[in-house]
Amino acid sequence: MLRIIFLLSLLFALSNDSVQDFCVANLKRAETPAGYPCIRPIHVKASDFVFSLGTPGNTTNIISAAVTPGFVAQFPALNGLGISTARLDLAPKGVIPMHTHPGASEVLFVLDGSITAGFISSANSVYVQTLKPGQVMVFPQGLLHFQINAGKTPAAALVTFSSASPGLQILDFALFANTLSTELVSATTFLPPATVKTLKGVLGGTG
């Protein structure tokens, strides 16, 4: 009998997605591996399903670029849907540094300007393309990729992800904005210690 109850409970859990139209996240509760708990449907409003990416981000920073996320933490209606979005703004010479999204593939749609984008495969093959407004490029899950403003005017793009929480790790920050000792970073990157110290100083790392 206990085995039957367990199997029925498991079946209900696995089929939960098919019996709920949506699950707007209750951000006051803790996130679980399955996402956030749902707000009760009677408390959900039409405005919960709307999010704005119409305002350009502030590009006055070290990378001359801005990312405005529309992940589940900002757009709770995405909870459980397996998708998310963001806006990229790049000033002239702006760059989204080499980075990965461990939890999602990415599709980039150029709105304005010219963006050179690319990724590196697990076989170290490089795929680079300069994109114009209206063009789209895909970046497979977990692969290193980047975007650079290739023009002399501001550029903007929308990106979508195959997860509500795609994750983000920027390579430069992972290497140099941490507390790992200069000696270890130097030994594992083959960079001179002086270069490592300089990069740590620029990006806020120590050690």
Curated annotation (Swiss-Prot):
The keyword Signal applies. Residues 51-197 form the Cupin type-1 domain. One of its GO terms (cellular component) is apoplast. Mn(2+) binds at H99, H101, E106, H145. Disulfide bonds join C23-C38. InterPro entries: Cupin_1, Germin, Germin_Mn-BS, RmlC-like_jellyroll, RmlC_Cupin_sf. Residues 1-17 form the signal peptide. Glycans are attached at N58. It is found in: Secreted, Extracellular space, Apoplast. Keywords: Apoplast, Disulfide bond, Glycoprotein, Manganese, Metal-binding, Secreted, Signal. Pfam families: Cupin_1. One of its GO terms (molecular function) is manganese ion binding. It comes from the Eukaryota. The keyword Kinase does not apply. Oligomer (believed to be a pentamer but probably hexamer). May play a role in plant defense. Probably has no oxalate oxidase activity even if the active site is conserved. Belongs to the germin family. This is Germin-like protein 1. It comes from Brassica napus.
